[in-house]
Amino acid sequence: MYSNVKYVYGNHDNIKEVLNDLEIEKVDGILLDLGVSSYQLDEKSRGFSYIGNAELDMRMDQDQELTAKKVVNEYSEENLSKIIFEYGEERFARNIAKNICIYRKEKTIETTNQLVEIIEKSIPKAKQNDGHPAKRTFQAIRIEVNNEIKPLMNTVKDSIEVLNKNGRLVIITFHSLEDRAVKEAMIEAEGRCT
């Protein structure tokens, strides 16, 4: 360990608050690892996985209110379709959202198996050859529940603001949505540089 390095566990969209709590104004470098906790994803009872059955939860932070169960049972068909398409890059998003809404009129969607069943019926069998058919929808709902993409623009902006001159910002992304959001924020920040 280095004496001039501080490792901080926290949410990246609170970077200014974290530094303020540490009484640090400026830093020479920031490393942001945007990856999700595989420990949490592997914990079947947390409802992240489309393999096995569990209550629909998907919260990284168990204290937050929004759950996957709330998303699939309370969001409008239009909003569900948008989330599944944008965050899951799922081309059958409209059909999945429509079938979720049809199913929940009869019965509350409470488990991962129920959601998987709906998704599998929403995607033509001939198109179910690119991994598990629920993969993209589960990713989309997880991203929505944990607000994983929206704060990235501000995180990049705030990180740049707290860097010393010639400071370095390193961001590790894990999927194209994060990558795209970070690139857009960097391009916007570059435009502000003189």
Regions found by a protein language model. Give the residues of each.
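S-adenosyl-L-methionine-dependent methyltransferase catalytic core, i.e., the SAM/SAH-binding region
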Residues: 1-194
